Amino acid sequence: MYKALFSRKTIDKIPEYYDCVHDLLNTSAVQELGEYTHHKGTTRLQHSLNVSYYNFLLCRKLHFDACSAARAGLLHDLFLYDRKQHEPVEGEGNHAVGHPKVAFFNAAEMFPINDREGDMIANHMWPLSPHMPHFRAVSYTHLTLPTILLV
């Protein structure tokens, strides 16, 4: 079973988190993220698990929608291609700006996501991307830099 970086427990041993994401976790689309390198030394699946788990913990502490944050964290990089070999589609812009839209469309097509989850996925690169999130959420896209977005 999977474990978030620095967590002492596997995620199946953390029922309040696991209950939020178990339906997504064993799908072929989420599993496929394990085939892509995210940054040096980690896969996109491990990165997404880290974002998901720590987003969940931080949102729970702040009394935000922790389940939606966990689900959005797991799906926020759901683009199924190698970003280093990907040719941007016209109008998509560079990868940093364009991939949230691709991840959102993939997530919305493959899974039942709510408005908050969709918003967090589509706008997780703000302020690099042009659209500001519509909901109060926590974006934990870098393990060392939680950014609280109060919208």
Locate each region found by the language model.
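Conserved small/polar residues in nucleotide/adenosyl-binding loops
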Residues: 141-147
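An active-site-proximal "capping" alpha-helix that borders the catalytic cofactor pocket
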Residues: 52-54, 98-108
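Short amphipathic alpha-helical segments at helix boundaries and their inter-helical linkers
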Residues: 78-88, 125-140
